[in-house]
Curated annotation (Swiss-Prot):
Family classification: Belongs to the dihydroorotate dehydrogenase family. Type 2 subfamily.
Organism phylogeny: Bacteria, Pseudomonadati, Pseudomonadota, Gammaproteobacteria, Enterobacterales
Residues reported to bind FMN: A62, G63, L64, D65, K66, T86, N139, N172, K217, T245, G268, G297, Y318, S319
Gene3D superfamilies, alphabetized: Aldolase class I
Annotated pathway: Pyrimidine metabolism; UMP biosynthesis via de novo pathway; orotate from (S)-dihydroorotate (quinone route): step 1/1
This protein's record includes keyword Cell membrane: yes
Keyword 4Fe-4S attributed: no
Subcellular location: Cell membrane
Keywords: Cell membrane, Flavoprotein, FMN, Membrane, Oxidoreductase, Pyrimidine biosynthesis
Name of this chain's protein: Dihydroorotate dehydrogenase (quinone)
Length: 336
């Protein structure tokens, strides 16, 4: 496979520049016959989750295609699902650059992107043009300048706009790069948000005559007490699924490595064990009443199987995809 050569060239570039260049090329081919260049045949291995049938258990995690620009090209690589976003009601530039860093020796990434995106209306227009035949998840968040106490309004605005076009909606309350966002994971703030989201979901179901499941994406840095509380809230509010996990603030496994001191969320292999442990504990708390989508450091078939053994129904990749490329998709789907 050609990817090791592509990676070598891309890794000569600044990480965000490499991402932009790759997406430039994918945008050129998406929806054209040139998509054949990235198309991979993978076996069909249907999995039912949140009332939806996924053609295979592997998805692309949110954050790579924030604006839904390359849905068809990414879909052609063999993913059973794509989660686009995180998208916010209004466009925003995100944090200052540089804001994305490779930890090459650890096969990890640190990002402090800050929900840079072109806004929900732009994403919806891109989704309308796409022909992906898998499940499309749309991950939503709040604008940086929206006060946390009004944060739920941003989620409701996005829900309303994406509902008709989403296979499922992911609620991102766990990015470490939007000030105060993670406080929405706790106590009354979480209950208040989930009540509003569930009410909005019911209203939108009546309007659109279809039920779009909602999953909440959580952080890996929850203590035992917080994790029990989150699981309890998700069950009480009849949320449809949970995505575990987002990036970590923990640097214990990357001490002394180049870029390890950068602020932001750490993903990739250093997150693998931590996210798997959260999935295992969540699974014990949820007792099969709510499905888990496992994400965090999956870079091999074994790592994907570990997430499923811990209690995940579906798995997603992001950093592993950056380091291993499209062959990782085929490998995981074939052998999982």
């Amino acid at each position: 496979m050609y990817y090791p050569f592509v990676r070598k060239a891309l890794f000569q570039l600044d990480p965000e520049r490499a991402h932009e260049f790759t997406f430039q090329q994918l945008r050129r081919i998406t929806g054209t016959p040139l998509e054949a260049l990235v198309r991979q045949k993978v076996p069909t291995k249907p999995v039912t989750c949140m009332g939806l049938t996924f053609k295979n258990p592997l998805g692309l995690a949110a954050g790579l295609d924030k604006d839904g620009e390359c849905i068809d090209a990414l879909g052609a690589m063999g993913f059973g699902s794509l989660e686009i976003g995180t998208v916010t009601p209004r466009p925003q530039p995100g944090n200052d650059k540089p804001r994305l860093f490779r930890l090459v020796d650890a096969e990890g990434l640190i990002n402090r992107m800050g929900f840079n995106n072109l806004g929900v209306d732009n994403l919806v227009e891109n989704v309308k043009k796409a022909h992906f035949d898998g499940i499309l998840g749309i991950n939503i968040g709040k604008n940086k300048d929206t006060p946390v106490e009004n944060g739920k309004d941003d989620y409701l605005i996005c829900m309303e706009k994406v509902y008709a076009y989403a296979g499922y909606i992911a609620i991102n309350i766990s990015s470490p790069n939007t000030p105060g966002l993670r406080t929405l994971q706790y106590g009354d703030a979480l209950d208040d948000l989930l009540t509003a989201i569930k009410n909005k979901q019911n209203d939108l179901q009546a309007i659109h005559h279809k039920y779009v499941p909602v999953a909440v994406k959580i952080a890996p840095d929850l203590c035992e007490e917080e994790l029990i509380q989150v699981a309890d809230s998700l069950l009480r509010h009849n949320i449809d699924g949970v995505i575990a996990t987002n990036t970590t603030l923990d640097r214990s496994l990357v001490q002394g490595m180049k870029n390890c001191q950068q602020t932001g969320g750490l993903s990739g292999r250093p997150l693998q064990l931590k996210s798997t442990e959260i999935i295992r504990r969540l699974s014990q708390e949820l007792k099969g009443q709510l499905p888990i989508i496992g994400v965090g450091g999956i870079d091999s078939v074994i790592a994907a199987r570990e997430k499923i053994a811990a209690g995940a129904t579906l798995v997603q990749i992001y950093s592993g995809f950056i380091f291993k490329g499209p062959p990782l998709i085929e490998e995981i789907v074939t052998h999982i």
